[in-house]
Amino acid sequence: MSGWWIGLIVVLAAIAGWGVWLMVGRNRVVFGEVEILNPDGGAGTALVVYHPGKSDFQRRVFAGFAEGLVAGGWRVELTTPSPLTPTGLDGVDLLVLGGPTYGFKPNRPIQAYLNRLGDLGAKPTVTIITALGMGQRSTRIMEQLVRRANGTLVKALVLYKARPNDEDNPVGGSQNQDLAVEIATRAAKTIDLAAL
């Protein structure tokens, strides 16, 4: 076999390995503790479950959303979707689900967690999808999954790491990511349990 063919096989194997890492490695379950913010919050209890992905963007967005809820007086339970994540929603007034999109779909751990929850019993639910630049399809899928599980969709956000989050005033790089966090925080501040 010539060196050219061997080189081609090595390149194709590397591309295949990278593809497997993208789809499997990024979709792996991350075990996280339940972090309780504002334990005495009287506005209601929100369970925020998100897949952290491979960068800190998801963590920042969901921390911003949690911060907005806390500013509104909510008790927030923040965690990741794993087999250990609580599935009992008694005492939970608002469910927040999301994380990164991979392969134009919501990440597998959040889909599996939503499956484990079963019937949401009309629970008010917010979805937050993060993406590099194309998250609309993933957001639609997440909305459908919540509705199919008998959840009441309160809000669906899609926030971008690279694509401008404000088409009228585009900013790039870290400014765009900071804007995504700010949008998440503002969105959380508008959620009023009495109006749900």
Model regions: which residues?
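Short connector loops at secondary-structure junctions
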Residues: 83-84, 163
